[in-house]
Regions:
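N-terminal ordered "arm"
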Residues: 1-58
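Detector for Asparagine
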Residues: 3-4, 11, 67, 72, ...
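A structural detector for beta-sheet-dominated domains
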Residues: 8, 35, 66-69, 81, ...
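A sequence-level detector of short, solvent-exposed, charge-rich linear segments
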Residues: 35-42, 62, 102, 122
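Short amphipathic beta-strand/extended segments with alternating polar/hydrophobic composition
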Residues: 44-45, 52-65, 210-218
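Short, Lys/Arg-enriched charge-dense amphipathic segments
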Residues: 47-62, 171-178, 195
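A broadly used, surface-exposed interaction patch
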Residues: 52-91
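Long, compositionally biased intrinsically disordered terminal regions
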Residues: 80-219
Length: 219
């Protein structure tokens, strides 16, 4: 089957491009997983990932779905920058067809499979709280990391900070708030829905979803 992605209109293609640009800002060397289910394209990224092949560390996954003009079967991994370049090329040519670039090497988070079913709505969180938790985490990371610190230590510090629960009432990691804000999934004044399934928590709006395992660590 031809794996070219054919979008319904220019707005959908621009939506993919904008999402990839935001994801690239959060992880300049990051990967994106594309899964096509018929005419629905699921676009996964992971702005925060512990790097464990066992999936036992902090893993925060962003998901946005986009409708396609024709059915497709695809489950592949690409570098974000490569897929973004392909999308931008199609936009420049005024084309709605994107030819996927060469696939990327496997990354551990792409093998982690959050539940696809069994999600139960457990409440809502005000958008203002999500934004505040994201800003507080960014400030804490900046304060904790001197310019001279090594990259490996810096990565551990970031994971420590983003892995902390935002509070007793909402036991999801601060990294989920960071991803919701950074990926453009929140809108001023619009509450974020919270779903739970088998130890996972999903934050959802009309703009996208962020999925992570529950966190009960507060320091």
């Amino acid at each position: 089957m031809d794996n070219n992605l054919i979008f319904q209109d220019s707005n959908d293609l621009a939506d993919l491009s904008g999402y990839l640009k935001r994801a690239l800002r959060l992880d300049g060397a990051g990967a994106v997983r594309l899964r096509a289910f018929g005419s629905v394209l699921a676009v996964y990224v992971s702005p925060i990932y512990a790097g464990s092949l066992l999936g036992d560390g902090l893993t925060v996954i962003g998901l946005r779905t986009i409708n396609l003009a024709s059915e497709n079967e695809l489950d592949s991994l690409f570098l974000i920058e490569d897929l973004l370049a392909a999308a931008e090329k199609s936009i420049e040519r005024d084309s709605l067809t994107v030819a996927p670039p060469k696939t990327a090497s496997r990354v551990g988070w792409a093998g982690i499979s959050p539940p696809r079913q069994g999600w139960v709505l457990s409440g809502e969180v005000e958008q203002e709280k999500i934004s505040t938790w994201a800003k507080d985490g960014i400030a804490e990371v900046a304060e904790a990391l001197p310019e001279s610190i090594g990259s490996a230590i810096a990565a551990r510090v970031r994971l420590q900070i983003w892995g902390k629960a935002v509070g007793i009432e909402y036991n999801f990691p601060a990294g989920s708030a960071f991803a919701m804000a950074g990926l453009g999934f929140i809108q001023k004044g619009v509450p974020v829905k919270v779903y739970r399934s088998h130890g996972w928590i999903r934050l959802s709006t009309d703009f996208g979803h962020v999925i992570a395992k529950e966190s009960f660590r507060f320091s």
